[in-house]
Amino acid sequence: MAAKHVLFSTDARQKMLSGVNLLANAVKVTLGPKGRHVVLNKSYGAPTITKDGVSVAKEIELADKFENMGAQMLKQVASKANDEAGDGTTTATVLAQALINEGMKAVAAGMNPMDLKRGIDKAVSAAVEKLHQLAKPCSDTQSITQVGAISANSDHAIGEIIAQAMEKVGRNGVITVEEGQALQNELSVVEGMQFDRGYLSPYFINQPKAGCVELENPYVLLVDKKISHIRELLPILESVAKASRSLLIIAEDVDGDALATLVVNSMRGIIKVAAVKAPGFGEQRKAMLEDIAALTAGRVISEEIGLELEKVTLDDLGSAKKVTINKDNTTIVDGAAEPSALQDRIAQIQHQLEHTTSQYDRDKLQQRIAKLSGGVAVIKIGAATEVEMKEKKDRVDDALHATRAAVEEGIVAGGGVALLKIANELSNLQGDNDDQNVGIRIALRAMEEPLRQIAINAGDEASVIANQVKTGDEHYGYNAATGQFGNMLEMGILDPAKVTRSALQFAASIAGLMITTEAMVSEVDKESAA
């Protein structure tokens, strides 16, 4: 077993604090509309220029192992805030740094770390309650635009495109961000359900100019297995031909004489037919087939439940108004499902979403809900260079998460104003003893720090700005972009309540752990051991 290096009490906390400050000082310069850029060197390619706090935090590894422990713990604050609300990473880092620095001073002065932690927790709980009271619902397009713009570092074009996307696909809709080919941002909305599987043979194409297959009012056959022999399909093909309708076959795979016969029939015009592979793999494929069945009011033909392909009737098939298939995607528009049946399926997936812990599964379930709800919006980012593209994409991702958070828990005055006002209101909060009172004071002072840092980054005097803001009503604040004081909501400077709440809670959580740390253990470096 490798030898270990152990540090205790003040020595341990001092090393940890040094790591915290190194990381926080690099991250906090990005806060606010006049936040500075940080340039990140990559082992390959051009350096990345960013104003995204979590991107900066992720890049930092320190040489000293004890300092690095402090930096990595602070990094957790940024990534947790990012996971919870998708934004507020820099705010969370600034709050945590203020709490840790003041907390360490109090511990060094001989105060009880556990009581300090209790005091901080008490102040944070009271602040979260006040935050919920202050929050105003965010449902109109203008508010969503403003939240998106603020989160994207005051880029109104990004705020507007996100608001348009949310308007088109609804709250449950999936909005994806991709790198575009043009210089301008573009928004495209896919109506109906789309999945990433194209036609199995180009000979199915009936729209040569567009290079796609279009089926009007088709039946939809869903099969949970590979189809290789045409005899399995003959009975249902004859029934569909008699009904003078087209047919879409979605199966695990279609090959051999089954595919050849379908192609020949399609080319001769005997029956309009197209075959595609089912989306997904394994259990995911079965779930997706069930979703398509719910959308088209059909059944999944599976031998697991005793349904055989040769015995399928027209009643087992789903149907849709239109299906478009190109080499990469299949889009089903206006499935024949009853709205109530579709809502039941969505509720079922929603239930799974609430009980899953994996982020990957959450994303997949969210996508399935969106596809059933009838829309996926794609924002294509336009930029002149690759470096600008990466930086812009990060900002759009942040803005997208922030707007979702705003719709979920409402909005409060931005620019650090909400936390400063709450700290002011809680100035008379008392703990059970003097050490707890010190913890409460530390937390309330830390809540002023985001506004102060925004002012510093804008080149203003933080104390003057903070004192001026304290004199006004609950929405009165400072617009660092223009240098003006006024009503933050009217000026369109808004923060999602969820982002502010999660930043404060995660910062307090990590600060509490660090303040109460009494020993640190790390492996001895081989060089120093030698």
Curated annotation (Swiss-Prot):
Residues where ATP binds: 30-33, 51, 87-91, 415, 479-481, 495
Keywords tagged on the record: ATP-binding, Chaperone, Cytoplasm, Isomerase, Nucleotide-binding
EC number: 5.6.1.7
CDD domains named among the record's database cross-references: GroEL
Major subcellular location class: cytoplasm
Biological process annotations from GO: chaperone cofactor-dependent protein refolding; protein refolding; response to heat
Pfam families hit by this protein: Cpn60_TCP1
UniProt GO molecular function: ATP binding; ATP-dependent protein folding chaperone; isomerase activity; unfolded protein binding
SUPFAM superfamilies: GroEL apical domain-like, GroEL equatorial domain-like, GroEL-intermediate domain like
HAMAP family with a match to the protein in the record: CH60 (MF_00600)
Family stated for the protein in its record: Belongs to the chaperonin (HSP60) family.
Protein name: Chaperonin GroEL 2
